[in-house]
A protein has these predicted regions:
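A shared catalytic/ligand-binding motif for oxyanion handling
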Residues: 1-173
């Protein structure tokens, strides 16, 4: 598989295995830009502590595939909170959280669940900020102005307060 997508071996590849019906997590990083200092694999999160060769600093990338079923969401939220709290370097959290944060994320009117409230509280307590996708239409939006959020295509990105100084072009607040 990797020979087809990376025939020149320019990427570090790390993955978390699939669990039950949930897919796994695959993350590739360009070797010219990053060294992987540490890998931590949770049930829902693959954390890579990186050395950024261009910025000459370390930061963590946490790739998420959140629990799809309500009975597992508390475990996912606890893992997210624990991994973020234990990081002693700036971090970026991105992936499919499988939790609707705001009612505007769906094309249908739905009320927010208890998990949405808990998830938003954790994000607030951790001081995370969301990077909103802007610009042109996306392939999953059916070329419409507004995004259609479907659990298998959603990608959200949250930043710890310390990392925005490393990635100034991605955000402004």
């Amino acid at each position: 598989f990797f020979r087809k997508i990376d025939p020149n071996h320019k990427f570090h590849w790390e993955w978390a295995p699939s669990r039950g019906k949930s897919g796994g997590i695959l993350c590739g990083l360009n070797k010219e830009n990053f060294d992987i200092l540490m890998t931590k694999c949770g049930k829902y999160i693959l954390q890579l502590n990186l050395f950024d060769k261009n910025k000459n600093c370390s930061w963590a990338l946490m790739t998420v595939y959140g629990a799809a079923h309500d009975e597992q969401k508390p475990e996912f939220i606890a893992e997210l909170s624990s991994m973020c709290h234990s990081s002693n370097i700036p971090y970026l959290v991105g992936g499919d959280f499988n939790i609707i944060r705001h009612s505007g994320e769906k094309n249908k009117k739905t009320s927010l669940s208890h998990f949405s409230e808990v998830f938003n509280s954790v994000i607030h307590l951790l001081g995370l900020r969301e990077i909103y996708m802007t610009g042109g239409s996306y392939t999953w939006s059916n070329k419409q102005e507004s995004r259609l959020w479907k659990s298998w295509i959603e990608f959200s990105c949250l930043l710890s307060g310390r990392i925005y100084t490393l990635l100034p072009l991605s955000i402004s607040w």
